[in-house]
A protein has these predicted regions:
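Exposed, low-structure sequence patches enriched in small/polar residues
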Residues: 1-163
Length: 163
């Protein structure tokens, strides 16, 4: 059942973002360090805020206009990673996330490949998510009891009718 923590929680975060461009290549890096302090009155009490200590997202991409500057092409790969932590689990009966302190998730890399193409007001995209799923074993979760998606492909068209 819901309750309010009887102690103060302190949350600290340092986030660094960097965007480097060399010619038509770009490297976009984001790294975040998080720390939480909670002095529990009872050692059996649940931690009320669970966050990974480190989170990183890095993208290497190539951008260029092709076909006489009529198509803008962008393609690249994205790397995501976070350290192990006690993630809240999703309870479908409550339609809410619930705090838990007994199963950790994290410490697995995730690679995605993408291609975006823009022609006037239309954007076409394709994304291959979790490229490395078959190489890293099948111990990756989005929350403690729900596995993260295996390799999947997303594609679509976005057509803006208004400016």
């Amino acid at each position: 059942s819901p309750y309010q923590a009887p102690v103060q929680i302190k949350y600290y975060k340092i986030k660094i973002e960097n965007h480097n461009r060399v010619g038509k290549f770009s490297l976009i890096n984001t790294a975040q360090y998080q720390k939480k302090e909670q002095n529990n009155l009872d050692t059996n009490e649940l931690s009320t805020l669970n966050v990974p200590e480190w989170v990183t997202r890095n993208t290497l991409l190539y951008s260029n206009y092709v076909f006489n500057n009529s198509l803008f092409l962008q393609t690249g790969i994205t790397f995501n990673f976070f350290t192990k932590f006690y993630a809240d689990y999703y309870n479908p009966l409550l339609s809410e996330f619930v705090t838990q302190n007994y199963k950790e998730i994290g410490e697995y890399p995730r690679f995605d490949f993408f291609v975006n193409a823009t022609i006037q007001k239309t954007r076409i995209f394709i994304k291959v998510e979790h490229l490395n799923s078959s190489f890293t074993g099948y111990d990756y979760y989005s929350d403690p009891f729900n596995p993260y998606r295996d390799l999947s492909v997303r594609f679509g068209v976005v057509w803006n009718f208004f400016e």
